[in-house]
From Swiss-Prot:
One of its GO terms (biological process) is negative regulation of dopaminergic neuron differentiation. This is DNA-binding protein inhibitor ID-2. It is found in: Cytoplasm; Nucleus. GO terms for cellular component: cytoplasm; cytosol; euchromatin; nucleus; protein-containing complex. A motif (Nuclear export signal) lies at residues 106-115. Residues 23-75 form the bHLH domain. The keyword Phosphoprotein applies. The bHLH domain is essential for its repressor activity towards the CLOCK-BMAL1 heterodimer. It holds the Pfam family HLH. It comes from Bos taurus. The gene is ID2. Residues 1-24 are annotated as: Disordered.
Length: 134
């Protein structure tokens, strides 16, 4: 028969319980708070990227999403009204028109934004939030 102290409980993960960072890596499913923090990081990143969102005012997540949707629609209108795109829509009859133009320039812009996001100090963005948002 083993004896234990009634004052101290026996724990397998006593080091991780004290916040020493010695624990198995958790997936967002294992740690819902981690997922919440990652989502909050993503909303913060969206707030930074969309120019119509006031930076000095607290806005709800719903407002952020509404601004993001409006911004995407504005970008789509700007893209559709770009002279190169307009000339593609006025092709000679008999030539097939593509319903959409390739997104190569958009993908380049996203790559640039991803590179800018990777320049943030690691204290501000965890690796998990970079994977989800970047």
């Amino acid at each position: 028969m083993k004896a234990f102290s009634p004052v101290r409980s026996v724990r397998k993960n006593s080091l991780s319980d004290h916040g020493l960072g010695i624990s198995r890596s958790k997936t967002p499913v294992d740690d819902p708070m981690s997922l919440l923090y990652n989502m909050n990081d993503c909303y913060s990143k969206l707030k930074e990227l969309v120019p119509s969102i006031p930076q000095n005012k607290k806005v709800s997540k719903m407002e952020i999403l509404q601004h993001v949707i409006d911004y995407i629609l504005d970008l789509q209108i700007a893209l559709d009204s770009h002279p190169t795109i307009v000339s593609l829509h006025h092709q000679r009859p008999g030539q097939s028109q593509a319903s959409r133009t390739p997104l190569t320039t958009l993908n380049t812009d996203i790559s640039i934004l991803s590179l800018q996001a990777s320049e943030f100090p690691s204290e501000l963005m965890s690796n998990d939030s970079k994977a989800l948002c970047g």
